Amino acid sequence: MFLNRGKSKKNLGAIALAGMVISSMIGGGIFSLPQNMAASAGAGAIILAWLLTGIGMFFIANTFKILSLVRPDLTTGIYMYSREGFGPYVGFTIGWGYWLCQIFGNVGYAVMTMDALNYFFPPYFKGGNTIPAIIGGSILIWVFNFIVLKGIRQASFINIIGTVCKLVPLIVFIIITAFAFKLAIFKTDFWGDAVTKTQPALGSVTSQLKSTMLVTLWAFIGIEGAVVMSARAKSPSAVGKATLLGFVGCLTVYILLSILPFGSLFQYQLAGIPNPSTAGVLGMLVGRWGEILMNVGLLIAILSSWLSWTIIVAEIPYTAATNGTFPEIFAIENAQHSPKLSLYITSALMQITMLFVYFSTNAWNTMLSITGVMVLPAYLASAAFLFQFSKNKKYPNKGPVKSYIAKYTGFFAVIYSLWLIYAGGLNYLLMSVILLALGIPFYIDAGKKSKREKTFFAKKEVTKIIIIALLALLAIFLFSTEKIRL
């Protein structure tokens, strides 16, 4: 066990990193995509929603690719881009918020895993918050902890296997629905404006788009996976390749999974299928074996994503600690170059959170929504940094990407990131500010122990701390007086 000062073992290639990106994006939610998308939209609106989301996310994905090439010195980008562009406190806050977000997200995977097991062993794991479910989820938290402790490279190899295994059922689903596809059914009520005795119209295309894009917005959380692990990448180009490969691959799967079922089932039928709806669709098309296959795929998908996020979630505080922004204890590695203390602390917090799930499912669902919003400022800060850096004289114009391309990529990524934050909801954003403010004492502690204490507590950094603290107090007031509710 030793304290790392920024020399992580660089042994992850483009395939391993792409596996990280795909696995972190494709979790259990994809197996419910047909119903989620059809619930309030016709096929036409769904195609438009994916087109618009794909364009927006392309700019974010390309932001990460460009930054990995023009600033390869800034490893673990989500945190480092924010710190480099906007100072130590913004960097800390982005890292802190991202870390909390993924801690709660990983506990969400524990809940989903146990709930998925309930299909095979009812009713012991129903809802994912029974006593057997809490015990099972807790065991898995520590199993993944020890897998990652054995080494990031080994864990990444297991993750690649898991990614392939969860893609197989999805590919089978796509093939079956493609063969069952009938153009006449697909064209029926393409824009969702038909009215029947039992089925009202779905509304305007605009309203369908709005409701559907709330689903597509969250489908790409995890696209930053390769960037977060860039300190362990074999080369900067591997990070960029993995990010774009993961983006294109996932977008293709999402579109096919959402659209092809409309060629064999009508919108109202898809909207009424219980989740995971991929199992329900195959159950209707091929029978029981298809339903079982998709439920097994769901379980593998959740476990694989959970492993990816276990690797990622410990990397942020670890990297922040290596340059003094997080408390030094997070920088301790083991002999396999895994962030030992960061993993243990993260897993311990996940374990504590897991216990709370047993007592309050509704509060837990609310917390997941809040922490989902907390990842979005990381995208905004990265995009803003690219836009800012593209206009800097230090930008390598003779490098792999021209400055004007970087500038427009950053600009449109900023616009789309702001849209994501707006769509997340003001109430959740304000609650997330309260959670961000909880990190202030840890920032102060790290700053006092840093060799760059003056930088940590420069006037502009103190001003930022005061602004976050005041916003948190305002949020507490608004929630306590019920002027804003979750």
From Swiss-Prot:
One of its GO terms (biological process) is amino acid transport. GO terms for molecular function: antiporter activity. It is found in: Cell inner membrane. GO terms for cellular component: plasma membrane. Its main location: membrane. Keywords: Amino-acid transport, Antiport, Cell inner membrane, Cell membrane, Membrane, Transmembrane, Transmembrane helix, Transport, Virulence. Coiled coil: none annotated. The chain crosses the membrane at residues 12-32, 41-61, 85-105, 129-149, 160-180, 211-231, 242-262, 296-316, 341-361, 367-387, 418-438, 461-481. The keyword Cell inner membrane applies. It is a multi-pass membrane protein. Catalyzes the exchange of L-arginine for agmatine. The arginine uptake by the bacterium in the macrophage may be a virulence factor against the host innate immune response. This is Arginine/agmatine antiporter.
